[in-house]
């Protein structure tokens, strides 16, 4: 699932919207969820996992998606792993609900590709290393691979070898509306339900509605990949897909390193001056410590705008207070500010002013030429120009053409005549 389709901490209020409650069920040793549209197995024991591994061994392609919790804990964690498999034969076992289920949309093309859906609980006391080993040998179908690959790498130390990203495939076909919901509607005429996006996926038991919502994210991926692959084959662009998917794997394997001296520089901090900046830095670090100790997102402790207001208030002589603070937290909050205010001016952080360096005339000329080539290729190929090369990439190559091989895959380089 793409990052844009997921909720983020930055936009949340102090009291995030709670998921609508439905009839909850416990996670027993065996469970089969039967809805009008789904029959799936929930994997929460080693025995269930063993049966799933047997099924994975018989297929070449596996659809995978994840659900994470970053709204209710300090560090984002993997909470659910959804898996869909093509069914080659009727096999009794986990999630078996009789004859092979062929999907809710009888008469549609994906009826010819029966499948089974499973939900693996990473929070259960089950060793998932055998699952990772099994998946590494398969082609993994994902929708917006970057988020899921990074989460699986952090949570399970899993690294995919081959992927089929349905977002990349759709964009190669010139499809502008490439959200999962849009693609499922386009190819299968099915409206995916909404909801549970802000739910607490780390809470147990999960509701039946939450699990149905989660499995929606893989249920259509295999037939969708079949449709997209067929169209790309007709256009002789399957190699383009392989190149871009391999690059996605490589990029997801690179750990994003953030400058520790940048983390506390939140939006609005540039308006602070002198001692206010020192207090903000101290309060930000205090909030991080409190959030980690409580295993809650930082915005549950204090929101960014409240940090900014508190920094200016302390320096002006006021004593900001918040009703939801315990006496211990209130004392630590004020102590952090007092300690920062005792720092000598030489230890105050300096707010950085960013001034762009205007590129030279030759660099501008090269950038304009690259844009012209890109836009012409985009029109000829019926692709979005930014999918061939975004503006930042154009500017980087105009400055240093040798970085083209790092920033672009071969088909993109060819489109720019590099």
Regions found by a protein language model. Name each.
Residues 208, 228-418:
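Accessory DNA-binding and partner-docking regions appended to nucleic-acid-acting proteins
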Residues 6, 14-16, 57, 157, ...:
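Short N-terminal alpha-helical targeting/association segments
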Residues 61, 99, 188-190, 237, ...:
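Short aromatic/hydrophobic-glycine micro-motifs
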Residues 2-39, 87-115:
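Intrinsic disorder/low-complexity segments
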Residues 53, 100, 120-124, 152-156, ...:
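Short hydrophobic/aromatic-rich motifs at helix boundaries and adjacent loops
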Residues 40-62, 69-94, 113-231:
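Conserved DEDDh/DEDDy metal-dependent 3′-5′ exonuclease domain
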Residues 10, 15-19, 34-42, 88-91, ...:
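Generic structural signal for short, solvent-exposed loop/turn connectors between secondary structure elements
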